[in-house]
Swiss-Prot record:
Family of the protein in this entry: Belongs to the RapZ-like family.
Protein's name according to its UniProt entry: Nucleotide-binding protein Nmul_A0081
Domain of life: Bacteria
Purpose of the protein: Displays ATPase and GTPase activities.
Keyword ATP-binding belongs to the record: yes
GO molecular function: ATP binding; GTP binding
Length: 279
């Protein structure tokens, strides 16, 4: 039986994620108290459900501290467990709450919205540290739906490498495990014919391939990830997010992510995300 537990900050997209899972055949339970996770999951298994998704977050704050133990209990039952945490930058959450005019679940007469967000972030800290994380700050609803569909299509029990390109001027992705800076390399942006293209286009690829510094940095990053990947696998990680950043996130970082993905796909499960191209 596969169980996906979705957690994260209010406004981060948990409802969208749960809807995608329901549309793909998962039996979904929203706002489940953590202390009921084992009992509900066992009951659903006995009822014939093989794929279940539950949302557990700060709305059930009285029992959140029990979640790590309940996940361990499920693993002892030989269930395939995935904990997914949706993270989002505070300024993005402020904008989303302003647009929807919804109340934060921790709001009261004494706390401002930014204070509620930080309280929730701290409340979920342990879950955040245990989970596979995705930064939804710059993801549209359609991009998040696509990411969730990719996530559930992965082979269970294997570590997945997520290579992500980004632009430093838009901030480092919150879900990064490794971050590499390629801003020191020649920038296709300053070539008039290459500027409107991306790192996926043949002309940009030829430009980058022809530079010895580019190839040397690629080999250094490839070797570093290759050398340390077994350590993350032994640590029972389900996900390893490798983020590659350049200035704008459209040329150099995209080129590196595509090239690294091609190399590692041969022996690993690989996902690719280009944050600025999908924004």
């Amino acid at each position: 039986m596969q169980v996906i537990v979705i957690s994260g900050l209010s406004g981060s997209g948990k409802s969208i994620a749960l809807t995608v899972l329901e549309d793909n055949g998962y039996y979904c339970v929203d706002n489940l108290p953590a202390n009921l996770l084992l009992e509900v999951t066992v009951y659903l298994k006995q009822s014939g459900h093989e794929r279940v998704a539950v949302s557990i977050d700060a709305r059930s704050r009285e029992t959140l501290h029990l979640l790590p133990q309940r996940l361990a209990d499920l693993r002892r039952q030989k269930m395939d467990i995935h904990l997914l945490f949706l993270d989002t930058k505070t300024d993005t959450l402020l904008k989303r709450f302003s647009e929807t005019r919804r109340r934060h679940p921790l709001s009261d007469n004494q706390s401002t919205l930014p204070e509620c967000i930080e309280m929730e972030r701290e409340m979920l800290r342990e879950i955040h540290d245990l989970a596979n994380r995705i930064d939804t700050s710059d993801l549209s609803a359609s991009s998040l739906r696509a990411w969730i569909r990719d996530f559930i299509g992965l082979e269970p029990g294997r570590l997945t490498l997520l290579f992500q390109s980004f632009g430093f001027k838009h901030g480092i992705p919150l879900d990064s495990d490794m971050v590499f800076d390629v801003r020191c390399l020649p920038n296709p942006h300053y070539e008039a014919l290459l500027r409107p293209l991306t790192g996926k286009d043949g002309a940009v690829i030829e430009y980058m391939d022809a530079n010895s510094s580019v190839n040397r940095m690629f080999e250094d990053i490839r070797r570093f990830v290759d050398d340390w990947l077994p350590c993350f696998i032994r640590d029972n990680r389900n996900y390893l997010t490798v983020a590659i950043g350049c200035t704008g996130g459209r040329h150099r970082s995209v080129y590196f992510v595509e090239r690294l993905a091609r190399y590692f796909t041969e022996n690993n499960q690989v996902l690719v995300r280009h944050r600025e191209l999908n924004a």
